[in-house]
A protein has these predicted regions:
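Exposed beta-strand and adjacent loop surfaces of beta-rich binding modules
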Residues: 56, 68-72, 395
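Solvent-exposed, conformationally flexible loop/turn segments
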Residues: 92-97
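A structural motif detector for short, solvent-exposed N-terminal "entry" segments of globular domains
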Residues: 28-62
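Gram-negative bacterial Sec-dependent N-terminal signal peptides
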Residues: 1-26
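Asparagine-centered strand-capping/turn motif at beta-strand->loop junctions
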Residues: 61-67, 77
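Short beta-strand and strand-turn-strand segments in soluble, beta-rich domains
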Residues: 74-89
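Long, compositionally biased low-complexity segments
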Residues: 89, 100-102, 107-483
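Intrinsically disordered, low-complexity regulatory regions enriched in Ser/Pro/Gly/Thr
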Residues: 20-21, 52-53, 66-67
Length: 483
């Protein structure tokens, strides 16, 4: 974080007490330097790019601090963010943990060559991985969408710090490597030995397709200042989640203004996290050139959507999002798409998505969405919307309009907006501090990237022919609207 942003953060936090916000010496924010207490990996996949060419997703998490840590690792499928696996992970000081998400005959699983402690134990055998499960969307938990294990093949990942492990305790002894291997032998006092965390986690995900000759590496989004309390939960518990943010205060910088906003009295505990992820416009590039047989997919993941959207056929979830989750139709939110080529020409064609969403306007309907251009389907997703274009290269804009008081196009009043409590606003240009009695964030809480592939076929070399395919991942650029 640069010096100006640090100064604005400190000044704004210092003024929050004037709004009656208590315990606000810490507030959740997206750390642009990539370190935090909670990490969100926007996408994993083990789908086939084409038949017989599956992806593997390689995950890493690093503890950069001098304290051992307990963290919750959670995998969520991409349609409705139903949990498919979670476990507790223990990282010793300066530790790294890695794992691979791989395809199985019916779904997906995970294995790790790493010896850091997990409870329950995660398989180290790639031929017999720890399997993802469908318990959270079948039987009494069914959401009227696909109930098969195939649904586990794509989604996203959360890693949430439960806390630091006190030095000199039996738990720290159990997780500390001795000659490269921790004993992992005694977690009986893990809850008592865990205190509030201090962040310092970072991580990466690589989507690799060996047979296609492509990989896409993406950094995890880091939430800093997530909790001032220990968040210990037993293995198998659905806690902690992103709704455990504490205190319920967010810090967001846009332009010269830094907003420190109180969410302590709003209906949903996760609002502070949604606020730091809110964007009203998302931008990125695309390449579809014939010569290089290029393709482009965009990933747009909304990691807090599940906290707002109930299951059912109604179109009036409580706040922020437009529609309930309606089985295989998903939960659709309207979006305006504008296309630009590299020579300033633009196209904005309502209803351009294919297949048409069930709401008859351009919309994204899942929690981990993949938007492909000209059906190039770089990632092989099933949670897919297609944007046709006549441009071979350029950039796109996705706009999420909304208003707290009136309809905005096809978006009803009160949707695509999140209204919080008071804010302290610090302006780095003028050095002044002001206050808002209510604060409106417009847009949707979305993260993601563009995956661009290029295929040059095989090239003859001194050692024989080699495959010359390439892939790159590019984080989205965004704007914010806060009033």
């Amino acid at each position: 974080m640069n010096t100006f942003k640090k100064k604005s953060l400190y000044a704004a936090l210092a003024g929050v007490s004037a709004l009656g916000v208590t315990g606000a010496a810490q507030a959740v924010s997206v750390n642009p330097d990539g370190l935090g207490q909670a990490l969100i990996y926007p996408y994993y996949t083990v789908r086939d790019k084409v038949a017989g060419q599956p992806f593997t997703s390689l995950l890493s998490v690093v503890n950069s601090t001098t304290s051992a840590k307990a963290v919750k690792v959670r995998f969520l499928e991409g349609k409705n963010s139903r949990e498919v696996l979670d476990f507790n992970l223990y990282l010793s000081r300066k530790d790294v943990w890695v794992a691979a998400i791989i395809p199985t005959a019916t779904g997906a699983g995970i294995y790790t060559p790493d010896v850091s402690c997990t409870t329950p134990v995660v398989s180290a055998d790639p031929t017999n991985p720890t399997l993802f499960v469908n318990y959270a969307y079948t039987g009494s938990a069914a959401d009227n969408a696909d109930t098969s294990l195939d649904r586990t093949r794509e989604g996203y990942v959360e890693i949430i710090e439960m806390g630091n492990i006190l030095a000199g305790t039996t738990t720290e002894d159990a997780v500390t490597h001795v000659a490269g291997v921790p004993p992992c032998d005694d977690f009986s006092s893990a809850s008592a030995d865990t205190v509030a965390g201090n962040g310092g986690l970072f991580g990466n995900m690589t989507l690799i397709n060996v047979l296609a000759g492509e990989d896409y590496g993406v950094e995890a989004v880091a939430l800093d200042g997530f909790s001032t309390q220990a968040l210990w939960a037993t293995p198998g518990s659905v806690e902690p989640t992103l709704a455990r943010v504490n205190p319920r205060v967010s810090v967001v910088t846009t332009g010269n203004n830094t907003y420190v906003t109180d969410w302590s009295t709003t209906p949903d505990a996760v609002d502070a996290v949604s606020a730091v992820l809110m964007h009203n416009n998302v931008y990125n590039e695309f390449v579809l050139e014939t010569v290089t047989k290029s393709g482009t997919d965009w990933v747009a993941t909304m990691p807090t959507k599940r906290f707002y959207v109930p299951t059912g056929s109604g179109n009036n979830p409580g706040r922020l999002f437009q529609r309930n989750f309606n089985g295989n139709n998903g939960s659709c939110d309207d979006v305006v798409v504008t296309q630009f080529d590299r020579e300033e020409r633009s196209i904005s064609v309502p209803g351009s998505f294919s297949p048409p969403p069930p709401v008859n306007v351009d919309a994204i309907c899942w929690e981990a969405n993949v938007i492909t251009l000209n059906n190039t389907n770089v990632l092989g997703s099933r949670n897919l919307a297609n944007i046709p274009t006549s441009f071979q290269s350029g950039w796109l804009g996705l706009a999420f309009s909304g208003s707290a008081t009136a309809a905005s196009g096809s978006v009803p009043a009160g949707k695509h907006v999140l209204v919080g409590g008071g804010s302290t606003v610090f302006n780095t240009g003028t050095g002044t501090t002001s206050a808002l009695t209510a604060t409106t964030f417009t847009g949707l809480p979305v993260i993601g990237f563009a995956a661009i592939s290029l295929a040059n076929g095989t090239i003859a070399g001194a050692g024989g022919s080699v495959l010359s395919n390439y892939g790159g991942a590019f984080l989205h650029k965004q704007t914010r609207s806060i009033q």
